[in-house]
């Protein structure tokens, strides 16, 4: 069963959109709290959430501020309303607390993808007792080949400008 709701962010009162998929049958195995990446939204994860729910996991995800439905206006996509990373971490904490309130007996698995992987690492650094398992995937990192890519891009740009 799919539930959608929202809560007012403790950081600044912004409405944060949340979705949960609940398995049809009990007992539930655990709760998976998903934390999405930059320029994503919670609906992108529905097929993955359905898969986990079929395996017996309760799955909860929220749209980060400035993403999906966690905006005041569609033109605001990408803007965090001044709250920045600290407000995003506070929103993750609010969702985490609500999960613990609804499912105190279940283990909580926190999973972050891409920008979400950076967020969950920062979250766990301060709130490790709130998580039973951490899954970090698609973490951004420095690519040693980046200077070569930048040089190629500059060369191609120069060639395009020269031939125009």
PLM feature spans:
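Short glycine-enriched nucleophile-adjacent loop
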Residues: 117-128
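Conserved alpha/beta-hydrolase
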Residues: 53-73
């Amino acid at each position: 069963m799919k539930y959608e709701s929202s809560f007012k962010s403790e950081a600044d009162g912004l409405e944060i959109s949340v979705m949960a998929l609940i398995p049809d049958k009990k007992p539930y195995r655990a709760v998976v709290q998903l934390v999405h990446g930059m320029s994503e939204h919670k609906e992108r994860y529905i097929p993955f959430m359905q898969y986990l729910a079929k395996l017996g996991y309760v799955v909860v995800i929220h749209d980060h501020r400035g993403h999906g439905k966690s905006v005041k206006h569609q033109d605001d996509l990408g803007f965090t309303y001044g709250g920045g990373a600290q407000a995003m971490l506070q929103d993750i904490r609010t969702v985490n607390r609500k999960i613990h309130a609804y499912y105190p007996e279940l283990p909580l698995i926190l999973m972050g993808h891409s920008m979400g992987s950076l967020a969950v690492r920062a979250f766990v650094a301060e709130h490790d007792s709130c998580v039973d398992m951490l899954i970090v995937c698609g973490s951004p990192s420095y690519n040693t080949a980046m200077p070569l890519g930048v040089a190629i891009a500059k060369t191609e740009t120069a060639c395009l400008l020269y031939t125009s």
